[in-house]
Structure formats: structure tokens, C-alpha cells
Amino acid sequence: RVPIKGSERSAGEYPYYGANGIQDYVDDYIFDDELVLLAEDGGNFGSKIRPIAYRVSGKCWVNNHAHVLKPKSMIDVDYLCYSLMFYDTNGLVNGATRQKLTQATMRKMKIPKITLEEQLKIVEKLKKVQGVITKKRKQLEGLDILIKARFVEMFGDPVSNPFNYDKVRL
């Protein structure tokens, strides 16, 4: 885990990860593996919708704001990631303005110990659910575009006001 100042980064093809995902792309990498990154500081601690862990695969650079985890032999990387994404960090993080999950505290975190077969079944189900969520999000984005288009079709562009509607102050 090595930070690179924004002014010193050379643009490239390799993702540069921080606590909450890709921050940039750089021309070199320090990892080439299947890993889980867990926020160390500046993470979405306490969020029920934004994860504190995410999975990375292949060549990448990770800065010092994320813990880099490589699962042990009998732990599936996706299972580890799903287990940590919304982990309850109450009482584990410290810091008033920028919460931090220290390495010592991270090592105290526990996930359910189940067989690899059970892990893979859980991961399969969660990936199916994630697929449904992704599909529904795309549908919602399409509906949002439709609403905007219908508004303009029905009332015209609010800035140019082609139907000369009266205007009121908000």
C-alpha cells in the first residue's frame, strides 16, 4: 500500500484504489491478484447502502487508505468481500472527523466460519440478487430519462418556456 500524490501520478491503465474504490488510473501496479480491499480511513463506516469493502481482481495499485486482504485457502474471496461489505464497525473505528479502522482492530473482526461449499452457495445467491438489483437500476435510469423527456414534451423546456407559461419565484 503506497500512496501517490495526485500531482505525481502518471496516467495509465491500472486502477489506483483508495478507501472507497477507484480514485484514478496509473501506469504501474503493485498487486496482481484476487483481493478484498477494506477501508482503513475515510471509509463509508456505518453506511447501510455504501460498502466498506470491495473486491479487486488483477493488476492494480492500492493506496494507504485501504487494508489489502488475501483470503486464506478455505475462504472464498467473494464470500470474504460480501461478509465485510456492510460489517458493523460500531466500536471498532475511532476518530472524530475522519474515522479509522486500524490494522489491530481489523484483525479482531470475525466472519462466520462455514465450509467452502456453503460459502460458494451463499455467493451464488448473492450474485443473483446483485444481478437483479443491477437490472432494476438500469430500468429506473431508463424511466428517469423517460420522465424528463415527457416533461419537456408536455411543458417545453423550462428555460426557453416555448408555451409562455407564467413564472413565479420559488
Tell me the role of every PLM-derived stretch:
Residues 46, 99-102, 140-145:
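Juxtamembrane/interface motifs at transmembrane-helix termini
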Residues 85-86, 156:
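Residues at helix-coil transition
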Residues 18-85, 94, 102-106:
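A short beta-sheet element
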Residues 9-11, 30-31, 61, 101, ...:
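A generic fold-level signal
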Residues 1-18, 108-124, 135-170:
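Non-catalytic DNA-recognition/assembly elements of restriction-modification systems
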Residues 76-77, 91-98, 116-122:
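Short, flexible active-site-proximal loops enriched in glycine and acidic residues
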